[in-house]
């Protein structure tokens, strides 16, 4: 099966394969088969709309992990200019699972911070598959405090299975690093906008997710545990992950209904990985609009709004 497609997209993959075959035949024999190709393309688009209009929570969770889905550095390249990556937590080391630095969004200085999973095997290992260690969160905290000092808005991009649970991370106090970030972000005197672009896994996501405005891409997820992890606890088997995903309410629309998410940003047909440029354009529009709104608030109003937002979690 084409690696671009997940199993529930197989009918789309089959149609795309037929279209490619016809294009090759046309190129080889100079045949005019444009009408047939156009018909199949229309059929493929209609089929895609049908499949993506009825996705289950588990299918959305799998889309959120798609290996070709744009990562933080992809969006940085599309959205920002003058990005200058900053490294290190000034305590232990640099963690490549968190990237961050100064940049400009349509000319406006901002601090950008996000998880980075990696594409190829070596990069995935170097970035620990997007699972930060304490030094990653401490680096993020250092950059956020720098942003406050220079009166720069903070934009975070969330995409992680969770914080790294290894022994070395626990030895360096993983839970303290996450908790400290929550404390600091709740008090920062600068606007914070967080966007879930893929997986939002537990405290590893929340550690850069305390904000004034929370966005989720249409096919992203946000939860305290993975569907497989939940299923393994409740049903003693990861095979119940589809049921767990539905029960947990991990999708953007469900979380919007609960009042946790402020804005669901629609994705291109087939997901963000089908057209990253279009996805980035939609994100740019939202980020600019939200920054304009938040910058109109004075510091006291900004912090009061953030506090009220945090305290409203869990209230029906």
Swiss-Prot record:
EC number: 2.1.3.15
InterPro entries: Acetyl_CoA_COase_a_su, ClpP/crotonase-like_dom_sf, COA_CT_C
Entry's localization field: Cytoplasm
GO CC aspect terms: acetyl-CoA carboxylase complex
Pfam families listed in its UniProt record: ACCA
GO annotation terms (biological process): fatty acid biosynthetic process; malonyl-CoA biosynthetic process
Highest taxon in the source lineage: Bacteria
Keywords: ATP-binding, Cytoplasm, Fatty acid biosynthesis, Fatty acid metabolism, Lipid biosynthesis, Lipid metabolism, Nucleotide-binding, Transferase
Domain CoA carboxyltransferase C-terminal: 39-293
Catalytic activity: N(6)-carboxybiotinyl-L-lysyl-[protein] + acetyl-CoA = N(6)-biotinyl-L-lysyl-[protein] + malonyl-CoA
Record pathway: Lipid metabolism; malonyl-CoA biosynthesis; malonyl-CoA from acetyl-CoA: step 1/1
One annotated GO molecular function: acetyl-CoA carboxylase activity
Matching NCBIfam families: accA, AccA_sub, PRK05724.1
Function text: Component of the acetyl coenzyme A carboxylase (ACC) complex. First, biotin carboxylase catalyzes the carboxylation of biotin on its carrier protein (BCCP) and then the CO(2) group is transferred by the carboxyltransferase to acetyl-CoA to form malonyl-CoA.
Oligomer status and interactors: Acetyl-CoA carboxylase is a heterohexamer composed of biotin carboxyl carrier protein (AccB), biotin carboxylase (AccC) and two subunits each of ACCase subunit alpha (AccA) and ACCase subunit beta (AccD).
Family note: Belongs to the AccA family.
Protein name as annotated: Acetyl-coenzyme A carboxylase carboxyl transferase subunit alpha
Species name: Stutzerimonas stutzeri (strain A1501) (Pseudomonas stutzeri)
């Amino acid at each position: 099966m084409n690696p671009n497609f997940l199993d529930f997209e197989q009918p789309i993959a089959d149609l795309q394969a037929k279209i490619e075959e016809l294009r090759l035949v046309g190129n080889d024999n100079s045949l005019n088969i444009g009408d047939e190709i156009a018909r199949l393309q229309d059929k493929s688009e209609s089929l895609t709309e049908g499949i993506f209009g009825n996705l289950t929570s588990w299918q959305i969770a799998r889309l959120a992990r798609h290996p070709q889905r744009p990562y933080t550095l992809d969006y940085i390249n599309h959205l920002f200019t003058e990005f200058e990556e900053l490294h290190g937590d000034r305590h232990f080391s640099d963690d490549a699972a968190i990237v961050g630095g100064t940049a400009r969004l349509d000319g406006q200085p901002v601090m950008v911070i996000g998880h980075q999973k990696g594409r190829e095997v070596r990069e995935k290992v170097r970035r620990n598959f997007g699972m930060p260690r304490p030094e990653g969160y401490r680096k993020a905290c250092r950059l956020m405090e720098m942003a406050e000092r220079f009166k720069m808005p903070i934009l975070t991009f969330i995409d992680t299975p969770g914080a790294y649970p290894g022994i070395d991370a626990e030895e360096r106090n993983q839970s303290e690093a996450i908790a400290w970030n929550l404390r600091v972000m709740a008090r920062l005197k600068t606007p914070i906008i967080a966007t879930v672009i893929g997986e939002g896994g537990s405290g590893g996501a929340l550690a850069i997710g305390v904000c004034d405005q929370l966005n989720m891409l249409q096919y992203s997820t946000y939860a305290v545990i993975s569907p497989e992890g939940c299923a393994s606890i409740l049903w003693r088997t990861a095979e119940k992950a589809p049921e767990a995903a539905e029960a947990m309410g991990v999708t953007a629309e469900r979380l919007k209904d609960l009042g946790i998410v402020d804005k669901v940003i629609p994705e291109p047909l087939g997901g963000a990985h089908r057209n990253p440029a279009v996805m980035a354009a939609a994100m740019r529009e939202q980020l600019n609009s939200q920054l304009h709104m938040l910058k109109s608030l004075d510091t006291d109003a900004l912090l009061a709004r953030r506090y009220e937002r945090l305290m409203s979690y869990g209230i029906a």
